[in-house]
Amino acid sequence: VLIIAVLFLTACQLTTAETYSRGRQKHRARRSTDKNSKWTRECTRSGGACNSHDQCCANFCRKATSTCM
């Protein structure tokens, strides 16, 4: 009986969460697209100009010369 009650409550929560998130689906898709574009951005190769570590493919920017290592 306890197992049936747990399954019933889980099903109720899943149904409620699904109907609540339907209105937010457009925003969720846009957010994941933005996240993917950050992951697939271009990086500067070794010897190229940089201002911060995250611009370089190797994630290291030498501040003294402003070049990627």
UniProtKB/Swiss-Prot annotation:
Pfam families: Conotoxin. One of its GO terms (molecular function) is toxin activity. Keywords: Disulfide bond, Knottin, Secreted, Signal, Toxin. Residues 18-41 form a propeptide. It comes from the Eukaryota. GO terms for cellular component: extracellular region. It is found in: Secreted. Expressed by the venom duct. This precursor corresponds to allele E1h. Has not been merged with other alleles since they may differ due to geographic variation (see strains in PubMed:19606224). Belongs to the conotoxin O1 superfamily. The presence of a 'disulfide through disulfide knot' structurally defines this protein as a knottin. This is Conotoxin Eb6.19. The gene is E1.
